[in-house]
Amino acid sequence: MIQISDKAQTYFRKLIEREGVPGMGVRLSAVDAGTPRADAKLEFAEPADLSGDEWAIDCDGFTLYVVAASVPWMDGAEIDYVTQSTGNQQLTIKAPKIKGEAPAESASMVECVRWVVENEINPQLASHGGRVAVQEVSAEGVVLLRFGGGCHGCGMADVTLKQGIEKTLMGRVPGVIAVRDATDHATGDAPYIPRDSAA
């Protein structure tokens, strides 16, 4: 399930000993699991902090508690304490399932489109403060999207749609034949590039 290296165990044990609280352990949880924003959270946990449904992993000198709801997302996780090329030491957590898994080949076109939008397209648009939401996926394979944030009203939305989003969706999701914009860009209040400024 979860692998915690000897170096990481030694690191945690020293920190816990410094705290001097009887029964203190380390709690591991997944934050925003199943999304591109997913992250792992480690924190000290005194016995009174525990809810009682955590999974307990006995380590050398302490217990690692995994929040019950986070267990599926942490399956296969590796916790290590590594020396970087700069000589600094750092705790690392690799949790391959924390952001979710791509839909199976048998998944519907809608599931596949939503996955690609949330895990590939929106993280790229976020650099401009933008995002897209899937409004509809027709049986014919036409995807209808609604732009938001910095993309709502942006003068480059058409280029983003055709050269970025449509190309990505058609290349990654079998059956997608076109991507259309359902956004009323005239109502955008903070576009990344105002429509009248686009070349």
Curated annotation (Swiss-Prot):
InterPro entries: Fe/S_biogenesis_protein_NfuA (IPR017726), FSCA_dom_sf (IPR034904), HesB-like_dom_sf (IPR035903), NIF_FeS_clus_asmbl_NifU_C (IPR001075). This is Fe/S biogenesis protein NfuA. One of its GO terms (molecular function) is iron ion binding. The keyword Cell membrane does not apply. Binds 1 [4Fe-4S] cluster per subunit. The cluster is presumably bound at the interface of two monomers. It comes from the Bacteria. Homodimer. Its cofactor is [4Fe-4S] cluster. Involved in iron-sulfur cluster biogenesis. Binds a 4Fe-4S cluster, can transfer this cluster to apoproteins, and thereby intervenes in the maturation of Fe/S proteins. Could also act as a scaffold/chaperone for damaged Fe/S proteins. Gene3D superfamilies: Fe-S cluster assembly (FSCA), HesB-like domain.
